[in-house]
Amino acid sequence: MFNQQRYKQSREAASRASRILFSLGFILLLSASDASAQALDVKIKVVPGTPQRVRVEGRRAESATAWSIRNFYGSAAGLAERVENFQLFGEDGAAVVVKKLAPGEFSAAGPAARFSYDFKLDPPAFVSDSSHVSWLTADRGLLMLADLLPVPLTNAKVELSIPAGWKVATAEARNASGVFEVADAERAVFAVGRDLKERRARAGAMSFTLVTAGDWAFTEEEAADSAAEILKIHQETTGGAPRQSPHVVMLPLPQAGAAGNLWSAETRGATVVLVSGRLPSKLAAKAQLDGALTHELFHLWVPNGLALEGEYDWFYEGFTNYVALRAGMRRGQLTFHDYLNALGSAYDSYRRARGPREVSLPEASQRRFAGSGALVYHKGLLVAFLYDLTLMRQTGGKNSLVEVYRELFRRHGRGEQPADGNRAVVAALGSAGGMRAFVERYVEGSTELTLPSLIEPLGLRVEPGGARTHVGVSDSLDSAQRELLRKLGYNERPDAESRKLHERLRKRSSQ
């Protein structure tokens, strides 16, 4: 259920490092000169053919001589290499000579306000990039303004032209003239295609729109019901609904012959994108959908609902893995035994990924796309688990990680003054129930996670024997431990199977 494709790890990071530094340096140079973020008026036209492409024409609010189009997004590289026929014009429409300095980096001979170019939008080579970048097929696609328009971006007015018979679905507002008025172009996503279907539904206090295309083993109603249940649970966790009614977009993977168990997901602003392979079994397909949505829908709140900045991926990805695990248990997707198995699996993955020395969670986030992606997800999940249970134990079950999330939204909900994400989250975690020392050691610090000793006070243990880590319940529990585990779904009778497994493993290890 926790598909390994979910982990957005880097590829070819070392060979790209110098190019990344060049691109970042050039963008910083632009922001310090005459390319400050400003409004755009643009027209994007989907042009059928091979390869699939869009034509982009537009105008900046103010003229500039330095122009840039994003070339990297996370682990996706070479995005600006898809740009062709890049041209610039003055306010009077006269052409301005332009020089290409590097992929996506252009210098104009004089001030230019108008621009035009073609963008090839073949599907990305890697399945894991399919939810993160713009692409088109003959039937459908994703258009993401963050990689289509000149950067840096603020707001934009977007006129979208699509082939006859196609539809567009987006969370962005459309005015009476049919033009989309985009308040934050970095977060804007447009799904386009000839077979798009929209279904509006409610989840507790909020409404949402499910956008689907293609054929799936489950029905649209079943997908909408899953999304509604998960959204309702996440509302209860955070204490409120997102500020904007979300769109949940489900599209088939655009790569021909992609395996059915592969998928990629991302949340930008109020849009959740899930691009997935198609499994023939309804049971397997529904389990894959539920697993993906349980994690990804929480991103509508964290980080997208918080006014926090910086690289605190360890929290909004790693801790979200734990929140998804608990939500899956509440829905009945996962049992208490599944919960323990997931922790054992995460511990094994953490030990494989930690390398020759331990690093703090903030440091792992800084290096996420340079080899530390697994630490962000697996160590983040483990620290969230240990934090949650330790806080519950110290407060007699009165406080948990849920209270930390609610406090974050009280202090730093979107609309508040932007703050540094690492500082804000560390402060919130450390202020709860005597958890300051825990946070200093396992979040800010680089203390190794030794699971057997850390879970013993919680009434859990690592089972002996076997190549993989198995977490089980201790033979003897005190009343506080028993009550703590019951809050997580532990039931002594069903857990008899786990005790039998422990006994078999103990005997095997002693032979």
Question: What are the residue ranges of the model-derived segments?
Answer:
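Beta/coil-rich, acidic/histidine-enriched accessory regions frequently appended to metallopeptidases
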Residues: Q38-V46, Q52-R53, R59, R82, ...
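N-terminal secretory signal peptides that target proteins for export/translocation
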Residues: M1-R16
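Bacterial N-terminal signal peptides
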Residues: L21-S31
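Extended, low-hydrophobicity, Ser/Thr/Pro/Gly-biased non-transmembrane segments
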Residues: R70-Y73, Y117-K197
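Juxtacatalytic substrate-recognition/specificity segment
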Residues: K197-Y312
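Acidic/His/Gly-enriched intrinsically disordered linker/tail segments
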Residues: L308-L382, Q394-T395, R406, R410-G415
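Zn2+-dependent metallopeptidase catalytic core
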Residues: G78-N85, F89, L153-A169, E181, ...
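A surface-exposed beta-strand-loop module
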Residues: V46-V47, S75-H132
